[in-house]
A protein has these predicted regions:
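Gly/Ser/Thr-rich active-site loops/lids in small-molecule metabolic enzymes
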Residues: 52-58
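Flexible glycine/proline-rich, aromatic-decorated loop/lid segments
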Residues: 47-51
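Ribokinase/PfkB-type carbohydrate-kinase core domain
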Residues: 1-46, 58-206
Length: 206
């Protein structure tokens, strides 16, 4: 499966974090950030549309995975770190899918707030190649689906206050901001202040 630039950047962030925390396996990390569902459609693009010069994608496979801060949570968990994860999802199928996949990975989801009447952000990527001609597919289109309005800052305040409860027991604070409302300047400043007071390393993934 082709890897886009956002995923490469997140992988590099995890590698740097693993290097920093290499001797702290089994420790807890506090993570605050935005989440989204990454959906990948794979298919063959053999023909052009009859009314516009765009490829017609014949989809044969669809994959989904937790993205953004949820992707970081999975990476931290995979290197032996307990993740105290704080974020929010919409009360919809996509939000439930994120929570279910994190639960299957053994990541605690008690810090994930479900927001009624709100859609979870979904990044939909379409990959295609010419059948029997190209082995490597390429991205043809990305479509983003989610809420049009920003969530109230009170949600970020709530997440930060919840994260504060276990922060002193963590070996690091990770903040992953995708400008979707889980992180604000005020909430990040509050958490970073407590982390510095307790000599806890802070890693930002803006």
């Amino acid at each position: 499966m082709a890897i886009d630039e956002d995923t490469v950047s997140r992988i590099e962030s995890l590698r740097r974090l693993r290097s920093s925390l290499n001797d702290m396996e089994g420790s807890q990390v506090t993570l605050l950030g935005d989440v989204m569902l990454d959906r990948y459609h794979h298919g063959y693009a053999n023909n052009l549309n009859s009314i516009a010069p765009v490829p017609v994608l014949k989809i044969f496979q669809t994959d989904e995975s937790p993205g953004a801060a949820a992707h970081i949570a999975r990476g931290l968990n995979s290197i032996g770190l307990d993740v105290d994860f704080h974020t929010f999802v919409g009360n919809d199928r996509e939000g439930k899918a994120i929570v279910d996949m994190l639960t299957e990975d053994g990541i605690a989801v008690t810090g994930i707030e479900s927001v009624s009447d709100r859609h979870t952000l979904v990044k939909i990527r379409f990959f295609g190649s010419r059948e029997s001609l190209l082995e490597e597919s390429q991205i043809l289109l990305q479509a983003d689906r989610g809420p049009l309005e920003q969530i109230d800052n009170s949600m970020s305040d709530k997440l930060a206050n919840n994260a504060m409860k276990q922060l002193e027991n963590s070996c690091a604070l990770v903040i992953s901001d995708y400008d979707n409302g889980a992180v604000t300047v005020a909430s990040a400043t509050k958490l970073i202040g407590v982390a510095r007071k307790n000599a806890i390393p802070v890693i930002m993934d803006p």
